[in-house]
Amino acid sequence: MGGCMSREASEEMEQRKKSQAIDREIMDDSRRLRRECKILLLGSGESGKSTIVKQMKIIHQNGYTVDELQHYRLTVYKNLVDCAKALIDAMRQFDIVPEHEANKEHMEFLYTFQVDPDPNVPLDLHVSKAVAALWDDPAVPSVLEHQSEFYIMDSAPYFFAEAARIGSPEYIPSEADVLRARTKTTGIYETRFTMGQLNIHMFDVGGQRSERKKWIHCFESVTSIIFCVALSEYDQVLLEEQNQNRMLESLVLFDSVVNSRWFVRTSIILFLNKVDLFRQKLPRTPLSNYFPDYSGGPDVNRAAKYLLWRFNQVNRAHLNLYPHLTQATDTSNIRLVFAAVKETILQNALKDSGIL
């Protein structure tokens, strides 16, 4: 009888060991699933990388506090004034004179105006009135016909339209303002957030040419790369080099990334961004003017597919490419896109861990 009890105890112990082993395996699988993911945001300057980071804060980090919104006030002031100066430069470059006499004085005032570096000092009321009046001048559409020949921020029409609100003494930037506010990214900025079962470390890297040598520090153990391309830049020139087409520059940069030895096992998520501006621009500025082998006319889907094909052509390493049409300033669009991005990252994580 003692032998029987000993055998039962032995079997029970064996079952307990098996159960513990299964529990450990489940926990290990869970840890592998809830893995740390390093995402590198790459792309040329003004392709929308920093806007994506801001959207992650809105979607995954409870948005901006009033204090954080206030922090962008000075940036918005500078953006508004810089856009006005860019418009004035273009009017002078193309010998376009405002039709309303008062706008000649507004141009002189705006061109010499300097934003107060103290963010607590409201914008001079004369600035917002002068900007609004100049933007409404009948001569301005003639300037915008030359938009591919001079540099102005994509957000210029937005800020011009909002000039009166921005010029209010009580002005606090909205999240929409923050998404469109532009500061040059220098160095590398990390954002951390949780997305379902994934702990994301997202790195926003400076897009200007002078910043690219710093990317090397982020290359190790990258899970995915989100490469941002501004579709609307097909007729634009670089801020750093006015005779270099921005889309061709993006293709060169993408070539160097996708075929790099650092990214042999990395999935590339391609954000074909600024689709809203792309849609507006195609009817008035044919894509075929800049890419003569394109024959799809102003159809936005055909044009986007053509540019995607151009990016696929340089993918000689045959990395998995996951393209998405995006509008980085639209929170609902980015929320939907990142739901798909999460699935892509999760599937690749499962494959890497051997679960799939």
UniProtKB/Swiss-Prot annotation:
| SUPFAM superfamilies cross-referenced by the UniProt entry | P-loop containing nucleoside triphosphate hydrolases, Transducin (alpha subunit), insertion domain
Q: Which Gene3D superfamilies match?
A: GI Alpha 1, domain 2-like, P-loop containing nucleotide triphosphate hydrolases
Lipid attachment, kind N-myristoyl glycine:
G2
Which segments cross the bilayer? none
Q: What's one Pfam family here?
A: G-alpha
Lipid-carrying residues in chain (S-palmitoyl cysteine): C4
Any single Gene Ontology cellular-component annotation: cytoplasm
Q: Where is the region G4 motif?
A: 269-276
Q: Which phenotype arises from disrupting this gene?
A: Decreases trap formation following exposure to C.elegans; formed traps exhibit abnormal morphology with a single or half loop.
Q: Which family does it belong to?
A: Belongs to the G-alpha family. G(q) subfamily.
What the protein does? Alpha subunit of the heterotrimeric guanine nucleotide-binding protein (G protein) involved in adenylate cyclase-activating ascaroside pheromone-activated G protein-coupled receptor signaling pathway. Binding of prey ascaroside pheromones to transmembrane receptors GPR2 and GPR3 leads to activation of the pathway and positive regulation of trap formation for nematode capture.
Q: How does it assemble?
A: Interacts with ascaroside receptor GPR2; to activate adenylate cyclase and positively regulate nematode trap formation. Interacts with ascaroside receptor GPR3; to activate adenylate cyclase and positively regulate nematode trap formation. Interacts with receptor GIN3; to activate adenylate cyclase and positively regulate nematode trap formation.
**Under which name does UniProt file this protein?**
Guanine nucleotide-binding protein alpha-2 subunit
Gene, per the UniProt record:
GPA2
